[in-house]
């Protein structure tokens, strides 16, 4: 069985997202001058947790790597102490 290569199909070039609507990301913790992210600051931690309870990656939030590691540790500590839920998928 032979495979026929179709050259009549035109491949569309890959388009990048328009930079017109893209907002520049910045690290909130660097701007605020935070030294250590506290696991008891639940309002801040909730901003970095998605709808399903997953930790939002740094490439989406713009957080620097140093603070992203602290953020991950703080969220995991808050979950362990039952200050934050592991997931929002629990049915009541």
Curated annotation (Swiss-Prot):
Keywords (A to Z) from UniProt: Ribonucleoprotein, Ribosomal protein, RNA-binding, rRNA-binding
A GO molecular-function descriptor: structural constituent of ribosome
Any one Gene Ontology BP term: translation
Domain of life: Bacteria
Any Gene Ontology CC annotation: cytosolic small ribosomal subunit
SUPFAM superfamilies (UniProt xref): Ribosomal protein S18
Residues spanning the membrane: none
One Pfam family this sequence matches: Ribosomal_S18
Function: Binds as a heterodimer with protein bS6 to the central domain of the 16S rRNA, where it helps stabilize the platform of the 30S subunit.
Oligomer status and interactors: Part of the 30S ribosomal subunit. Forms a tight heterodimer with protein bS6.
Family stated for the protein in its record: Belongs to the bacterial ribosomal protein bS18 family.
Protein name: Small ribosomal subunit protein bS18B
Organism encoding this protein: Cupriavidus pinatubonensis (strain JMP 134 / LMG 1197)
Gene responsible for this protein: rpsR2
């Amino acid at each position: 069985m032979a495979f026929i290569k179709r050259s009549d199909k035109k491949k569309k070039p890959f388009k990048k997202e328009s930079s017109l609507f893209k907002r520049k990301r910045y690290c909130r913790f660097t701007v605020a001058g935070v030294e250590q992210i506290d696991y008891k600051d639940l309002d801040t931690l909730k901003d970095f947790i998605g709808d399903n309870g997953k930790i939002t990656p740094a490439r989406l939030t713009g957080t620097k790597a140093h603070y992203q590691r602290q953020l991950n540790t703080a969220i995991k500590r808050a979950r362990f102490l039952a200050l934050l839920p592991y997931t929002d998928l629990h049915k009541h």
